[in-house]
Amino acid sequence: MIFGSAKNGKQHPWKRSAKDSVGRSAAEVVDPAYVLIDGESWFQIENSHLMPEFFTTPASPDNHWMFISSHGAVTAGRKDAEHPLFPYYSIYKLADMAESSGSLTLIRVQRPDGRFTVWRPFQKAIDRNTCSRNIYKNVDGNRIVFEEMNQELSLVFRYQWSVGKQFGFVRTCEIVNLSAAPVTISILDGLQNLSLIHI
């Protein structure tokens, strides 16, 4: 999937710096819009980290169900709550489980001076001075993308949940280097709180 990923030092196409009508930078404004990605129309919520938490769900052609918090917590399964891939929780409980149910990614980045920095995208506390988040959902409604941009590290990490009849729930990930310089990284990526008895 091509998001117009900025490589070779080019600016990320959706990161703006202009001021809005009240003098706030665009990085401080929630900006919903339709965008075209790989020829497909998506609904984008730019700076979604500035919004109160909300929930969404991908459409399924079969009997899959999934509820995803804008903070990343997931409950999902097939048919009903008795057949979960991730344990079924009410939205009130799920709201407290962003760091313990769903995706987990740790990225160790080697700095030019040899030091290491560990970046955990989508952790509950976000440093708004260096990071911003966007959420995308395709018009068909069966794919949802979470994106975090780290300006300090010049990296973008995004992951996608999709639902299909053949493979069921599919999660894919991508990391993009926004700078012209090569970067050395190590990634630990996986899922937490799977209900293994039902897999």
Residue ranges and their predicted role:
Residues 1-197:
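Anionic coordination/interaction segments
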